[in-house]
Amino acid sequence: MTTTIPTSKSACSVTTRPGNAAVDYGGAQIRAYLHHLATVVTIRGEIDAANVEQISEHVRRFSLGTNPMVLDLSELSHFSGAGISLLCILDEDCRAAGVQWALVASPAVVEQLGGRCDQGEHESMFPMARSVHKALHDLADAIDRRRQLVLPLISRSA
């Protein structure tokens, strides 16, 4: 089922399936779901100057909470230079809110970022992961490390 929803700047269409709706902004389909470790936002299709503002608005909603976020762009077929603003805004929002996030990039995204993503996850402009599975695994590891730091403090106070 597809429904067109008018917004203040443009119209988007929403395609629903049981339990998960995809929102379409001019060639980019956005789907989000809550995993127990993070909110995973997947964007397929194309991000360009014509739709990046609407996509940014939609994606920013998921960075305003306290849940970590994985932005999955692995299935993007086109990512213009205008899309970098989406990543910069998301990075700023997450840093300001203290929310951990990770980017899963397609070859089109890697190309726009100057190929820096394939040099390793620690040398890129943004927090990178090779897959959603790897991003969620890294988040689980980070939670375990924080727990290990806190456990000695708890046992001392008891």
Swiss-Prot record:
Provide the positions where the record notes the PTM Phosphothreonine: 2
- The answer to keyword Phosphoprotein applying to this record is yes
Per the entry, induction is: Highly up-regulated by osmotic stress. Also induced during oxidative and starvation stresses.
User: STAS domain spans which residues?
Assistant: 28-139
Regulation of this protein's activity per its record: Regulated by PknD under osmotic stress.
Superkingdom per UniProt = Bacteria
List keywords of the entry alphabetically.
Answer: Phosphoprotein, Stress response
UniProt modification remark: Phosphorylated on Thr-2 by the serine/threonine-protein kinase PknD. Also phosphorylated to a lesser extent by PknB and PknE. Dephosphorylated by PstP.
Family the UniProt entry places it in: Belongs to the anti-sigma-factor antagonist family.
Q: How does it assemble?
A: Interacts with Rv2638. Phosphorylation abolishes binding to Rv2638.
According to UniProt, the name of this protein is Osmosensory protein A
